[in-house]
């Protein structure tokens, strides 16, 4: 079984102007819709010992985009969900990944960016790969503007703050990170 979670809506407003109802509506469609659909298929995948789950995030969600606090929150929450389900699904034959597409669609055409040149048919091969036998586990695959790349979230190189760390040292330490 394969689940591709791709439902979405936009309710763009700056954080100061977005209503809680609009914020919740975006979370309900993007996050809770994906949770409900995936939950419905999960036990079947476990029983079959095989499955693929693809969540749809977004570069706007991952890196931020003005006026999209609700959208970014929902899209990053899906990445957190992917991270956990990839761990839980690993021993059960279930591969869980996230697609971060960048293409002009009906939903995004009003936000036209002259630098954006991607089309949905350039994203489709990424979806097919994430649903294939060769699918990776726990990967964020960006398919944007005719190019593919992975997006990784990882800690930077740590610095040793010594045995006693005093908060007033923070401003001097942060640039070293």
Where is each model-derived feature located?
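C-terminal helical subdomain
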Residues: 115-177
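Active-site helix of classical SDR
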Residues: 38, 74
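A short helix-coil junction within the Rossmann-fold of NAD(P)-dependent oxidoreductases
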Residues: 13, 40-49
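Active-site loop-to-helix junction immediately N-terminal to the catalytic Tyr of the SDR YXXXK motif
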Residues: 18, 64-72, 84, 112
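Residue(s) in the substrate-gating loop at a strand-loop-helix junction
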Residues: 58
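Active-site-adjacent segment of SDR/Rossmann-fold oxidoreductases
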Residues: 63, 79, 84-94, 133-135
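Substrate-binding pocket helix/loop in short-chain dehydrogenase/reductase
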Residues: 14-15, 22-24
């Amino acid at each position: 079984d394969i689940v591709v979670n791709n439902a979405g809506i936009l309710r763009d407003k700056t954080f100061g102007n977005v209503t809680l109802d609009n914020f919740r509506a975006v979370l309900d469609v993007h996050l809770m819709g994906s949770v409900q659909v995936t939950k419905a298929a999960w036990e079947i995948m476990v029983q079959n010992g095989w499955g693929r789950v693809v969540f749809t995030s977004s570069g706007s969600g991952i890196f931020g985009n003005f006026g999209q606090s609700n959208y970014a929150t929902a899209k990053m929450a899906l990445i957190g969900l992917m991270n956990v389900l990839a761990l839980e699904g690993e021993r059960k034959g279930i591969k869980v990944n996230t697609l971060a597409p960048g293409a002009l669609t009906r939903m995004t055409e009003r936000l036209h960016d002259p630098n954006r040149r991607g089309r949905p048919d350039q994203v489709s091969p990424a979806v097919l790969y994430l649903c294939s036998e060769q699918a990776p586990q726990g990967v964020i695959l960006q398919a944007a503007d005719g190019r593919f790349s992975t997006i990784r979230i990882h800690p930077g190189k740590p610095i040793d703050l010594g045995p006693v760390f005093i908060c007033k040292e923070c401003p001097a330490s942060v640039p070293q990170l």
